Curated annotation (Swiss-Prot):
Family: Belongs to the PPase family.
Organism from which the protein derives: Blastochloris viridis (Rhodopseudomonas viridis)
Subcellular location: Cytoplasm
Main location (coarse class): cytoplasm
Cofactor field: Mg(2+)
Taxonomic lineage: Bacteria, Pseudomonadati, Pseudomonadota, Alphaproteobacteria, Hyphomicrobiales
Name recorded for this polypeptide: Inorganic pyrophosphatase
Inhibition and activation profile: Inhibited by ATP, fructose 1,6-bisphosphate and 2-phosphoglycerate.
Note on cofactor: Has high activity in the presence of Zn(2+), Mn(2+), Cu(2+), Fe(2+) or Co(2+) ions. In the absence of metal ions, there is no activity.
Keywords, sorted A to Z: Cytoplasm, Hydrolase
E.C. numbers: 3.6.1.1
Reactions that this protein is recorded to catalyse: diphosphate + H2O = 2 phosphate + H(+)
GO CC terms of this entry: cytoplasm
Assembly: Homododecamer.
């Protein structure tokens, strides 16, 4: 997973 994907979750 990408940092932005985790942050958006």
């Amino acid at each position: 997973m990408r940092i932005d994907a985790i942050d958006x979750a």
